[in-house]
Amino acid sequence: MLRFRCILSTSRSIMSGVKEFDYLVIGGGSGGIASARRAREFGVSVGLIESGRLGGTCVNVGCVPKKVMYNCSLHAEFIRDHADYGFDVTLNKFDWKVIKKSRDEYIKRLNGLYESGLKGSSVEYIRGRATFAEDGTVEVNGAKYRGKNTLIAVGGKPTIPNIKGAEHGIDSDGFFDLEDLPSRTVVVGAGYIAVEIAGVLANLGSDTHLLIRYDKVLRTFDKMLSDELTADMDEETNPLHLHKNTQVTEVIKGDDGLLTIKTTTGVIEKVQTLIWAIGRDPLTKELNLERVGVKTDKSGHIIVDEYQNTSAPGILSVGDDTGKFLLTPVAIAAGRRLSHRLFNGETDNKLTYENIATVVFSHPLIGTVGLTEAEAVEKYGKDEVTLYKSRFNPMLFAVTKHKEKAAMKLVCVGKDEKVVGVHVFGVGSDEMLQGFAVAVTMGATKKQFDQTVAIHPTSAEELVTMRGGVKPE
């Protein structure tokens, strides 16, 4: 009987010219693939549509190649300090082409692993660009598909400003297409993407200028983190040139191919590469969402509820196109939980968008989880918030001429001083934060932090030995 129903369903699908799936996923990025493969574990039929390389932003032009380039730039810093540790090493030459070739080969292998994963999970991989038709089906290269449930996970693309000559620059995705290290670079933006790219280029030897609209970078992060990184960029020993309160007004390309960047505070000449890193827009316009009643905000982000439902029944969305926490692990977690809810009877399974840890691969590093000081004050009131802070010199730089500071902050609330925010600036922040994120998620208190015996000598021990709490200013 079950086989008869399957044959009947397939016959109807063929006769109607529409191929049907229990779950149709539009977008082969981290969130879409994670949700598709998890759905297959529950025995449903799944189709996945993608027009570009599998893996989406993270694998191809985001966190993975970015981390490779960050690691590369770290080696330049190590070489800088080698003499102070007794090594006779100098940086004679850096070959951008070598690391680009190795990085691109690594990404290509990951693309292949994603495709193998889909095949191994029996997810049907449909290559092409998707758009909703008037009848509610999804069209790809002239063929029609329909999902009993349809997931939109198409991600986003970099924003290009409406400025005269803006087309002479490249976007943050284009950074990974550069064939050589630019002799002089201008990066525009104050968010984590701009900060990371500028730091990599500056440390690898490009004369790099970071242009920010206001007086600080990372203004949405905790004030301590924003202040510390901005101050570090202002140091004479930092190879980066920071231009505060600066906006680009015009870009002029000369006959020699070099750019002149006119700004509100001056002119930067002989620029080989201009990189726009001012934000990202969702890739939703080409989907024709209005045909199926999916509502978006004014920026084009898909509006979803706490269960990832859109305004259209049976159509859901996760990832960057929802505008919530543009982070790969968030998209993966939301996508997998969604599949559990839709296909495994877990009707209340959803991602809670709280205490999500993140790291900025800046120079120095930043790690953060939970509420900022300002958010805690707004949520609980100033009288309920207690702050613990520490600023010190990491041991790595105890014997080097070059010095870097580290800074840490715990944001605690209530009489029991529940830790609701952990913010870390300095070497090692990326690797130390994950464990503290678990503690924050579990609701640990300052007393429990204090009862933890420190690992010495480490930077992380500061987080369990801080004393002298203060109130917000």
Curated annotation (Swiss-Prot):
UniProt xrefs under NCBIfam families: gluta_reduc_1 (TIGR01421), PRK06116.1 (NF004776)
Family indicated by similarity: Belongs to the class-I pyridine nucleotide-disulfide oxidoreductase family.
EC category: oxidoreductase
BP terms from Gene Ontology: cell redox homeostasis; cellular response to oxidative stress; ecdysis, collagen and cuticulin-based cuticle; glutathione metabolic process; response to superoxide
Gene that this sequence comes from: gsr-1
InterPro entries: FAD/NAD-bd_sf, FAD/NAD-binding_dom, FAD/NAD-linked_Rdtase_dimer_sf, Glutathione_Rdtase_euk/bac, GSHR/TRXR-like, Pyr_nuc-diS_OxRdtase, Pyr_nucl-diS_OxRdtase_dimer, Pyr_OxRdtase_I_AS
Residues annotated as binding NADP(+): 190, 193, 196, 213, 219, 279, 326, 359
Alphabetized GO MF terms: flavin adenine dinucleotide binding; glutathione-disulfide reductase (NADPH) activity; NADP binding
Classification of source organism: Eukaryota, Metazoa, Ecdysozoa, Nematoda, Chromadorea
Cofactor binding description: Binds 1 FAD per subunit.
Induction / repression: Induced by the oxidant juglone and starvation.
Name under which the protein is recorded: Glutathione reductase, mitochondrial
Residues bound to FAD: 30-31, 50, 57-58, 66, 130, 320, 328, 456
Location, primary (coarse class): cytoplasm
Residue pairs linked by disulfide bridges in the UniProt entry: 58-63
UniProt KW keywords: Cytoplasm, Disulfide bond, FAD, Flavoprotein, Mitochondrion, NADP, Oxidoreductase, Redox-active center, Stress response, Transit peptide
Active site: 456 (proton acceptor)
Pfam families: Pyr_redox_2 (PF07992), Pyr_redox_dim (PF02852)
An annotated GO cellular component: cytosol
Phenotype caused by lack of the gene: RNAi-mediated knockdown causes a severe decrease in survival upon treatment with oxidants including juglone, paraquat and to a lesser extent, cumen and tert-butylhydroperoxide (tBOOH). Enhances further the production of gamma-glutamylycysteine and glutathione disulfide upon juglone treatment. Increases gst-4 and gcs-1 expression. Reduces lifespan. RNAi-mediated knockdown in a trxr-1 mutant background causes an arrest during larval molting characterized by a partial detachment of the old cuticle and an impaired ability to reduce cuticle components.
